[in-house]
């Protein structure tokens, strides 16, 4: 039997407000336990919540970015459940009337070597408060409770069950991560829990309309864990059904060491939480004027920039999608092109996706911390274009520029000069190199003249070696062919 996978994601994004959603306590990560709390966060009697305007505006920004409906009237509700790090005994969330309704997120997905642009329909995005944390280490066999995180503003983003593979779910999650960090509404730090996903996974026979029984995998805080957890859960469910069993609705956790999911508890439905409107908070009213003010301050969005890169710089869909995965990288690219000229757009894209990206990954830093400024890279590209250096030598110069950590605008020129790396384009000098190589490699010359055309590659390699990589490759190839066919 063939199976279809059905996936929906719920993503918890911590909003970048300086204070909590219903109190004035700070939201700084990493403070000593229970030093960032207030009577509201601790649920002390008589303490009343007050809505954080900044959290609302970040939700509005997100809704506008995905083409959603911003509800003019939304309501906060109490989600009732017991957990040690939930001091009130309920979480303030939104149920029937969320602030963001509908919308779509588009993303690029590699399918059979081709890039497809797909989109996922969102059900909603709602505001809520985060819970505290249970600490299980260093407490002499007991569990400690840290309420610093309690009350941190969250925007929970819920999709329709539109995704059909783990790869598609990861591509969507990455696009969502790009969007919320691009907007500046979330810092996207997955290690600190600022962006974490719950995956709802089910399987059904191909062609069946009814959904299978779903299981929810909680708190996946890396894209690799998300993909591995979904793939394992899909295999588990299919094997269970094919062996005559049935999938039981449950909440599961992913164990990255064993690379498997395990049951945490039976899966709750909405009625288990006994939602009801919070009597301490009035309905949230968002006026058209408020929405217009937020929209006026919105940056260019990744999708619009991706389309502009394809249109204005003649980049491929793939190149444009990669460059717009990060606002910092996209802005750096445009700064390079502005300095080097529009004709350098494709070389700039290649360098950013190649040498620059690999160096950033190796040093585990963002483009904002790169020691090579956009204008410095632009000059390097110009020196390749005008024949001063070859692409191979440019890589050496780039490495030296990175290590130099200099703010000199002429850094590329200075290094080329000081290291003697200028490309040899003088015809007399090149001719001498070619003559010496031909004289020393009579066998390769004979093979070429006998019809083995690839023999020229060996001669080319010897000539480049003799010039220490500085010979102009195009001129060298032309000169070699001329002398070999003379």
Curated annotation (Swiss-Prot):
Membrane-spanning intervals of the chain: none
Gene Ontology biological process terms from the UniProt entry: glutaminyl-tRNAGln biosynthesis via transamidation; translation
This enzyme's EC code(s): 6.3.5.-
Entries under InterPro entries matching the protein: Asn/Gln-tRNA_amidoTrfase_suB/E, Asn/Gln-tRNA_Trfase_suB/E_cat, Asn/Gln_amidotransferase, Asn/Gln_tRNA_amidoTrase-B-like, GatB, GatB_C_1, GatB_Yqey_C_2, Gln-tRNA_amidoTrfase_suB_CS
UniProt xrefs under Pfam families: GatB_N, GatB_Yqey
Disulphide-bridged cysteine pairs: none
One GO molecular-function entry: asparaginyl-tRNA synthase (glutamine-hydrolyzing) activity
Keywords: ATP-binding, Ligase, Nucleotide-binding, Protein biosynthesis
Catalytic activity: L-glutamyl-tRNA(Gln) + L-glutamine + ATP + H2O = L-glutaminyl-tRNA(Gln) + L-glutamate + ADP + phosphate + H(+); L-aspartyl-tRNA(Asn) + L-glutamine + ATP + H2O = L-asparaginyl-tRNA(Asn) + L-glutamate + ADP + phosphate + 2 H(+)
SUPFAM superfamilies documented for this protein: GatB/YqeY motif, Glutamine synthetase/guanido kinase
Family statement: Belongs to the GatB/GatE family. GatB subfamily.
Stated role: Allows the formation of correctly charged Asn-tRNA(Asn) or Gln-tRNA(Gln) through the transamidation of misacylated Asp-tRNA(Asn) or Glu-tRNA(Gln) in organisms which lack either or both of asparaginyl-tRNA or glutaminyl-tRNA synthetases. The reaction takes place in the presence of glutamine and ATP through an activated phospho-Asp-tRNA(Asn) or phospho-Glu-tRNA(Gln).
Assembly mode: Heterotrimer of A, B and C subunits.
Protein name: Aspartyl/glutamyl-tRNA(Asn/Gln) amidotransferase subunit B
Source organism: Janthinobacterium sp. (strain Marseille) (Minibacterium massiliensis)
